[in-house]
């Protein structure tokens, strides 16, 4: 079967992620990478993460912590963000807040929302390679 006949035309513009190629370099033991947005694992607050994990999975709400949730994000976190925004004079509601799993997901959502067919996107130079990949996928 000729898969090109059934795939969306945007697939012709898609290519391997530059970030994925950069990450392959990290497998080399003599490389100290300053690219790719990879933080030093020694800086991770692992003990704080462990305590938060244990607290979250204790008690009667443990099952809810592992369950699927609304796509907008965890409502108590969105409510907390609303309160924090109000403290600095920015009015909003939880419906104005969208929690993403990271910058890449946010960029893909923005690209879906903002890029029209044959539209133009301006970026600075140098720019985040992940943004180019997210934007390039849309007409």
Predicted regions and their residues:
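N-terminal "arm"/small-domain region of PLP-dependent enzymes with the aminotransferase-like
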Residues: 1-71
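Conserved core of the PLP fold type I
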Residues: 57-58, 63-139
